[in-house]
Amino acid sequence: MNDVIIRQLAHLIPYQPLWEAMQTFTARRQSQTTDEIWFLEHEPVFTQGLAGKPEHILNSGNIPLIRTDRGGQVTYHGPGQLMMYLLLDLNRLGLSTRTFVRTIENTVAESLQEWGIPAQGKETAPGVYVDDKKICSIGLRVRKGFSYHGLALNVAMDLTPFSCINPCGFKGLMMTQIQDYVNPIEMDAVKRTIIPLFLKNFGYNQPAIMVETSLEFLIDDHLRSFSEKLGERETVTNSRQN
């Protein structure tokens, strides 16, 4: 079994520098680099995937639009949405891209079912749905067997900006969130549910290496090696997820 580092970022994180940090991590990682999962919430932003078509952006208003290198069409990120960026070595995990996506979907659905939400994936479209409403979007990039980008799980957020786009390229697609079924709901409670399931379903050692990290620390990947940074300006705790 393999170790994984789970980094948790506080505050609302701007998209562009976080995306650049993911790219840098992926470009510089080697076969022995430990996999990482980054948990955070973004400042309001629309992101357009590589397959994105302009007609799916109905009215972005004053919310920034960033064209990225992930798969998929346009989606929205904002406060109250849990982002999980999956920086994994798929070859080491023995996963094809298709199996990787299905494992993500099944893990998210399993975590939502623990809250009594009847969530499931769809064969025809990536993501996790409750009936015909989408609750979790998935957009990935795999380079030389290394994945980055990840998933966006709607927890307790303002869903209004989704009406300004055709979410994931589907006209009229309705979005939903955990808060619509479990109210009140806390972000930390969602993390406590989903983390152990990810560790189990992807075959990682438990407990995970839990790290409180700042955006500035991640940006330093442009200048310093992982080994030089380890243990600096961050608090590392090996805590079991219950």
Swiss-Prot record:
A GO CC term attached to the entry: cytoplasm
Gene Ontology MF: a single term: lipoyl(octanoyl) transferase activity
Disulfide cross-links: none
Residues carrying the site annotation Lowers pKa of active site Cys: 134
Keyword presence, Metal-binding: no
Statement: the UniProt record of this protein carries the keyword Signal: no
HAMAP family assigned: LipB
Protein's job: Catalyzes the transfer of endogenously produced octanoic acid from octanoyl-acyl-carrier-protein onto the lipoyl domains of lipoate-dependent enzymes. Lipoyl-ACP can also act as a substrate although octanoyl-ACP is likely to be the physiological substrate.
Designated name of the protein: Octanoyltransferase
Native source species: Coxiella burnetii (strain Dugway 5J108-111)
